[in-house]
Amino acid sequence: MHVSYSLALGFGLAAAAAATPAGAATLLALTNDSRLVEIDSETLGAGRPVAIRGAEGRLLGIDQRAADGRIYGVTDTGRIVTIDHRSGQAVVVARLSEPFTPGGRSVVDFNPMADRLRLMGMNGANFRVHPDTGAVTRDGGLTYQPGPLGGTVPRIVAGAYTNSIGKPSSTALYTIDTSLGQLNLQAPPNEGVQQARGAMESLPAGVAFDILADAQGGNRAWLLSAGQLGVVTLETGQVRLLGAVAGLPGSEIVDIAALH
């Protein structure tokens, strides 16, 4: 069945949908009340929410670490935790060496080359974190490169690295600015420079985003927004909607991790 989606979805993503997307994935969604929900991108169905226990705080974001395959999260109390997404049991493995105040949404994503956790906030905070010790390196604040958007304050709400499988020879960090409806390449990541890649049209303030790499060197970018699942073209920012995810909880989704 072929279904078309329009602006009636509540946000103006450019979209034409297919019933069964190529490269189907299992996505792990994090709610704002610290629950995990598995999403099947092929069936567009959500599993039963699993409450996270033992995190010692509210989870700000999650990601799967390429180095060991485990799910990691960062809490609003500065804890770095590993999470069994089947049971919801979290274990504190480290504490951030410096306080992190995101000023809204947070980005939590692993750099697979360096095996370091990128932690960023809507207020421009840009941390590089050792996941085993919690040691923080404060990198350059988030800014747009000189040009049409130079001087504009980024409001980055989501971000993810490419090639997050094994220990790759290269990677790239993509971010989403919902105030401008913009997909960016953050390069260099440590300097926080946002390079515009394409307009994503009107987006809600909160979106969840991750990139799933495959063994052949491909990358598929997933977006969850207002209960709708889509695929993002990283070269242009265009979003192809796949449809509404059935069975999502009423709580806001703040992050997704695409599972290997």
Per-range role (PLM):
Residues 17-21:
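N-terminal signal peptide c-region/cleavage motif recognized by signal peptidases
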Residues 24-42:
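An edge-strand/N-cap motif at the start of beta-rich repeat modules
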